[in-house]
């Protein structure tokens, strides 16, 4: 990782540290892959039991999820089934689905927080880059709480995003503990596991809390010589 990227991460951390973590929101997408349970389980007649898949082949069913958090809580996610993706003729979550999530779920959830101003932080996935469309989606639902929408520096999510470091990993482990599942229960399992997540320690791990050294996780401090 270059010294320049470390400086970009540090600059954004300084900006976000000036906000309360309860006013900094992260949004991202993840997925859970399921395969048929390898052992016999108790399910209703005609139902197939599933467990989290270790492979990524076409034989595993993928459930996509859009999720958000602020420093003290997670917000209601949106889960897309393999059938919904097939009907929409898409392989994953696209921009239209993201904007629909804002319209159906997120705008109302944001206003329910009753906090202003909020800052929304995203990685540089292609579906996130049209910031004007995102702002308009919130505006169309009379949601005015989000003042800023920021894109993280390239390849910075593992160091800056609580979702990538490492809420999504912990969430998948919670889902694994609740398997086996069926097609009727997997969305509830995914949602219930997500609502139990606690973002606060992950914000600290990402250097987003006040007075945290913005270079604390620099991979090469003696080479980069930050601040010298």
Predicted features and spans:
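RNase H-like polynucleotidyl transferase catalytic core
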Residues: 48-57, 140-162, 179
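Short helix-terminating capping/connector loops at secondary-structure junctions
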Residues: 19-20, 113-116, 143-146
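Extended, low-complexity cationic-aromatic segments
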Residues: 6-107
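Short catalytic/ligand-binding loop motif for oxyanion handling, primarily in non-cytosolic enzymes
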Residues: 33-36, 75-76, 127-131, 157-162, ...
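C-terminal anion-handling pockets and recognition modules
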Residues: 20-24, 31, 156-157, 163-228
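Acidic/histidine-rich, metal-coordinating catalytic segments
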Residues: 28, 102, 113-130, 152-161
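Short, aromatic/basic amphipathic alpha-helical patches
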Residues: 130-143
């Amino acid at each position: 990782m270059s010294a320049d990227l470390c400086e970009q991460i540090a600059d954004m951390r300084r900006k976000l540290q000036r906000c309360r973590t309860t006013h900094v929101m992260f949004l991202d997408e993840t997925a859970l892959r399921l395969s048929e349970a390898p052992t016999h389980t108790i399910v209703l007649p005609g139902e197939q039991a599933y467990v989290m898949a270790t492979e990524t082949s076409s034989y595993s069913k993928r459930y996509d999820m859009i999720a958000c958090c602020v420093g003290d809580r997670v917000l209601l996610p949106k889960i897309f089934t393999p059938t919904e993706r097939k009907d929409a003729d898409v392989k994953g979550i696209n921009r239209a689905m993201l904007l629909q999530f804002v319209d159906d779920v997120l705008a109302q959830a944001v206003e329910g927080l009753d906090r202003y101003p909020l800052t929304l932080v995203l990685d540089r996935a292609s579906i996130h880059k049209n910031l004007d469309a995102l702002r308009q989606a919130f505006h169309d639902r009379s949601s005015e709480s989000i003042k800023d929408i920021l894109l993280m520096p390239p390849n910075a999510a593992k160091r800056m995003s609580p979702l990538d470091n490492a809420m999504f990993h912990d969430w998948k482990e919670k889902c694994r503990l609740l398997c086996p599942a069926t097609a009727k229960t997997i969305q509830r399992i995914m949602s219930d596991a997500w609502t139990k997540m606690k973002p606060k320690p992950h914000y600290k791990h990402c250097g987003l809390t006040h007075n945290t050294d913005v270079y604390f996780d620099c991979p090469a401090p003696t080479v980069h010589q930050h601040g010298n």
